[in-house]
Regions:
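Active-site-adjacent beta-strand/loop module that shapes the phosphate/pyrophosphate-binding cleft
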Residues: 24-29, 113-132
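Conserved Nudix-box catalytic region and its N-terminal flanking loop in Nudix hydrolases
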Residues: 36, 41, 46-90, 137-139
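Nudix hydrolase/Nudix homology domain
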Residues: 4, 69, 80, 106, ...
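Acidic, metal-coordinating catalytic segment for phosphate/diphosphate chemistry
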Residues: 10-46, 52
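A short, amphipathic edge element
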Residues: 1-10
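Short, solvent-exposed loop/turn elements at beta->coil junctions and helix N-caps
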Residues: 10-11, 108-113
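Conserved hydrophobic/aromatic beta-strand scaffold that supports enzyme active sites
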Residues: 20-24, 58, 123-125, 145-147
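Short, structured loop/turn "capping" segments at alpha-beta junctions
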Residues: 85, 96-107, 117
Length: 180
């Protein structure tokens, strides 16, 4: 199997949020795709945050593209040259006010949609978290913090109360570590 070749790449637009690129590609058999669109987004981090009382820290926020509210795990984008581990600790503290003296446990790094997007999500587990600060939200963030008993997560996923893919996948990746 051979790689595709990029014959030409032009930005349709660039923004602080992400870029849209239009490429011309050559397939291994010589076919040409004149307009292949690639979304360039930054990597982001998320975490299952477990308190000492065996509750999972979730955030509820409105997601404009889906036109609905979602119950999710804390997440965010690393700042310039910020290590993923530092980024998730900062994001959890800013969004929820929770911290932990223990280091985040890496669950994995996964491409979000490698067909059309360049970014990865890096998922962590943070244990023994406790509330130590008030939220420090960005001007465009409106987030409610909710604590959910660990034993209720699977029911909430099964019933669709939690239906954001990256929250669900991080939970199931962390499950074997949560029961220890």
């Amino acid at each position: 199997m051979s790689n595709w070749k990029t014959l030409n790449a032009n930005y349709v637009y660039k923004t602080a949020f992400g870029n849209l690129r239009k490429d011309t590609c050559e397939l291994p058999d010589g076919q040409i795709i004149e307009e292949y669109y690639v979304n360039e987004y930054a990597d982001w981090v998320n975490a299952i945050v477990l308190t000492k009382e065996k509750q999972i820290v979730l955030v509820k926020q409105y997601r404009y593209a889906a036109q609905d509210f979602f119950l999710e795990i804390p997440a965010g984008k690393p700042e310039e040259d910020e290590a993923y581990e530092h980024a998730i600790l900062r994001e959890v503290k800013e969004e929820t006010g929770f911290i932990s003296e223990k280091q985040p446990i890496l669950l994995g790094e996964f491409y979000v949609n490698p067909a059309t997007q360049t970014n990865k999500v890096v998922s962590f587990l943070i244990v023994d978290a406790h509330k130590a600060f008030d939220q420090e939200l960005d001007p465009t963030e409106f987030i409610d913090v909710q604590l959910v008993d660990l034993n209720d997560m699977e029911t909430m996923i099964a019933t669709g109360e939690i239906n954001q893919l990256f929250t669900v996948s991080a939970y199931y990746m962390s499950k074997s570590l949560l029961t220890k």
